[in-house]
Amino acid sequence: MISNISITPIKTMFKNALNIHNFSFKSHTSTAIIGTNGAGKSTLINTILGIRSDYNFKVQNNNIPYHDNVIPQRKQLGVVSNLFNYPPGLNANDLFKFYQFFHKNCTPNLFEKNLLNKTYEHLSDGQKQRLKIDLALSHHPQLVIMDEPETSLEQNALIRLSNLISLRNTQQLTSIIATQI
């Protein structure tokens, strides 16, 4: 089970960014990381995910170094990141089927059913973002980490996203969200 994610700095890297001292994310709640552009939100998220190993932070999940236990727990993790894109030629339906191969209970919530056959590269930025959010949440992961999920979303999609996060809270699931809002 993914819980008790803690971050311990080995050395502070910047004067105004990522100045963190022994921080833990509380399980079964939503935590917002709020900051301006360049504050280090994405760097922190990528460090937690093990994507950035060049920053001097020690990230642990249940007192086990995060990079050592990502693979066994990947089915319990959902991620929304602008770093992730999908190969050309795949449509949303293909991507949901791919996710269903690993996660049997994969269900879309934000993505319009009439766009399922449209290829990823032909989706608008807002449609791509809704698809990324849906793929991250569709298997009901124990932990979802979202880096600026509000990017390119119109107001009604923002409201639906907020409702999905609230629903996760009632289900005692953990969400970590980096945002400027």
Describe the role of every protein-language-model region.
Residues 144-148:
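Catalytic Walker B motif of ABC-type/P-loop ATPase nucleotide-binding domains
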